[in-house]
Amino acid sequence: MTLVLILIFIIAWKLGYLKNTLKNWDLKRIFWLMGIVFFTLATNYLVTVLVLKTQIISSVTSDTGMSDILGQLPILCQKYILGIIVPLSEELLFRSYIFGSITNKKVAFLISSVLFALVHTGFSWYLLPYLILSFIITWVYSKRNNFIESAIVHSSVNLFGGSAIKLLDTFFKLLPY
């Protein structure tokens, strides 16, 4: 796995996709990114609640079978794959390569986002939550053409999305309304 990630980075570096990745990192950018991560996790929660309350589907998870495969691996390996390998490789593909290859940025935004959601869900009701998530992650990338920022948001959702949904659900149940 690590060898694959190293090869992906070498190819991306040779093709020039890593140009803006480490420029101008300051406290303002870090707080902006933390806000985006929180916003994304909250949006993920709201979409999940909306989809489940309307009973379009019974659970909001990808139906690609990846969770079955990952479930057989040790937890540390799962976190490594979901938190590092998958976000970095998918962001290089969908944001750096696909988004970066299309000159019309609105078309690039739409194609990159929709392809990301389709690869994760196929043509199913699961598409809606993934499409909204993909729009947010693509927007983060489009702000500075920096795939590391979008990979951080992507990784946060992969690692903390389920926990955030449970935490926010508990929080909203405690509110007196």
UniProtKB/Swiss-Prot annotation:
The regions listed as transmembrane in this protein's record are 2-22, 30-50, 117-137, 152-172
Q: One GO cellular component from the entry?
A: plasma membrane
What terms describe the molecular function in GO for this protein?
endopeptidase activity
A Pfam match is Rce1-like
Question: Topology versus the membrane, per the UniProt entry?
Answer: Multi-pass membrane protein
Q: Which UniProt keywords apply?
A: Cell membrane, Membrane, Transmembrane, Transmembrane helix
- What family is reported? Belongs to the UPF0177 family.
**Keyword Membrane in annotation:** yes
Q: Which GO terms describe its biological process?
A: CAAX-box protein maturation
Q: Which gene encodes it?
A: yxdF
Q: What is this protein called?
A: UPF0177 protein YxdF
Q: Please, which domain of life does this record's source organism belong to?
A: Bacteria
The species is: Lactococcus lactis subsp. lactis (strain IL1403) (Streptococcus lactis)
What subcellular compartments does it reside in?
A: Cell membrane
